[in-house]
Amino acid sequence: MTAAEIAEVLGMALSTVSGILTRLGFGKLGLLGLEQPVRYERGRPGELVHVDVKKLGRIERGAGKRWRDGLRQHYNPTYTDLHGRRRQTVGWEYVHIAIDDHSRLAYAEVLADERATTAIGFLTRARRFYRRYGIEIEQLLTDNGSAYRSRSHALACRKLGIRHLRTRPYRPQTNGKAERFIRTMLAGWAYGAIYASSHERTHALDGWLWHYNHQRRHSAIGHQAPVSRTNLLGSYT
């Protein structure tokens, strides 16, 4: 956790927490290999929105384990298909995320795959989400995945009036804000609690996103929540 996150959880002033960490020898990030990277930032909400996908293993019956007679045993749920073959039911889910470069306002959905049609549907709903905060997506930055290189995705961006940019090949750090948001999301939501099922984990996502956007203070934007930088009051054109 960062000093800002500790201060928020404990209800203490950030300066107080920072002072305590410094006295304990945790004041210099360089000693821990956590130097703050040099970051850029777009000048207004919507000028650039980062989009990415994170693959997560499905959770079924306690994440693939079960208890019987007080003993934990491996559990591999299967079913028989129409041809009489045994199939495993546990697979993957795909968390599609969008984060605004200027405000850090974020949107995410858990979806079944990362195909072009799915990515287009996500983009359409993400655009609707940002418009509720007075933000129009001008440019979109993604990696070079097949969904984002498809003709249908290009046509969708054109129809929505969005300029599509892609990262340099083999340089995922170009989309660094998306990568950092995914790490935060995994720590705070996906791995931040014990879930009995994928459905329970998915159900918890909206609440975590609301906290991230409305309450969680972000050091890169003056220790304010992302919503504080949105266009609800018409500050940007």
Show where each model-derived region lies.
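Basic, flexible linker segments flanking DNA-binding modules
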Residues: 1-70, 146, 154-156, 168-172, ...
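C-terminal domain-tail junction helix/linker
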Residues: 38, 46-47, 54, 158-162, ...
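Active-site-proximal, Lys/Arg-enriched surface segment
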Residues: 55-91
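Active-site beta-loop-alpha junctions of metal-dependent nucleic acid enzymes
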Residues: 75-78, 84-95, 109-134
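Coil-to-beta-strand transition motifs
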Residues: 89, 101-106
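A short acidic/small-residue loop/turn micro-motif
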Residues: 100-102, 112-116, 145
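Short small-residue beta-strand/loop micro-motif enriched in glycine and branched aliphatics
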Residues: 105-109, 165-167, 191
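RNase H-like polynucleotidyl transferase catalytic core
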Residues: 137-144, 158-177, 193-196
